[in-house]
């Protein structure tokens, strides 16, 4: 990690705000805790699993924490526990309690900070630019780690979109422009899901890196692309200037093939087009981005 844990001491605290209950969940008070006892639910973060922001007691000491309960298919709480136990960093969550029997769950201590989406707001003046180099360097720091971990689990996003999908989207001109299938050569430790929602900021520095459930040894360029491509509603990383600032920060600690990164970004954008059909503004942005990508590759 680029941020030295000692740099975080004395920084002002900023607490994340989370929504009220937005779907049916398990009752976290019925979970078989060992060293943690929840006292009050403070919020329900949006996530694939059931996640609760709570006030509670850890070995008798008052703490704020997050309880993650496996819900979605493919959830791997045990992988996250194994990885977090090796990191020992002030900017990664400390494990307070867990259980892998029955319905697996994990309790981690809260880290202070805000998401860049909150800090940058509408990002009218590219306020994001002053954060993106450290964002890129933080991911490069993860890629330098040498820890015990399994290969990342296969995901559809790793594979070139099917010709039928490209045809349905009228994107046939993109055929053949995606990276070759991933191999086991030159793998590095990858976060697996580092996007703006999983990184916190305080006093203009990274204060937290969250959600290591999908982490493991995998493809460096895909992990970078996953961090870079724009999600629906996101107001930053819309411009080439922002992307280059991120990559500039990444190159402070690591190297990458920028052309392959861009091809993986295109791959991810196609998959998001398939599911984000009702967000007209996002779809228009993605199609314009993909058209520019195709022109760069001499296809349009």
Where in this protein do the model-derived segments appear?
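Juxta-kinase regulatory segment immediately upstream of eukaryotic protein kinase catalytic domains
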Residues: 2-40
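An alpha-helical support segment within catalytic cores of ATP-dependent transferases
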Residues: 20-33, 144-192, 196-204, 286, ...
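Conserved protein kinase catalytic core
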Residues: 74, 115, 199, 217-219
